């Protein structure tokens, strides 16, 4: 994941990670992954808050993850055991996602507030999952939207875009590159507007 972003940004962004865990939550995956009438994973907020409280007890200092100094942890990412709903026939599994939803947890007279979360699955169709879904969800945290049709069956760039189905190339082990638009959006590669008489070679 670190190398993916380093390459896509031409060395301008190299994320660093602190791995904490594993932790075991109090309920089964079906509780956290249960779908409602209009929303997937209606209890996902309980997943986040419980996992954050358990993780917070394993890491003494969270200040390194407060980039702007506002006293809030900017982002936490979870890899949960088993399959995700993106590749499972079980509707009660959790769908990989990024969520902006401030949550505070308390333990030992301490309060830690988290601004946003992301999560993805450990397994993909019975095998160890690659990095594609994690890269996709982290890209949401950086500001990129989905570029697949979230309400219908229209095709976009499909497997040619990391924010579409490109995160699933070779089961996530070889996610596609970011598009020129996405790199421009991130400020990593400025798009050049071509005039009608501009000569270009590919």
Feature map (PLM): residue ranges:
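Active-site-proximal segments of metallohydrolase catalytic domains
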Residues: 1-110
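Extracellular hydrolytic enzyme modules, especially secreted metalloproteases
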Residues: 75, 81-202
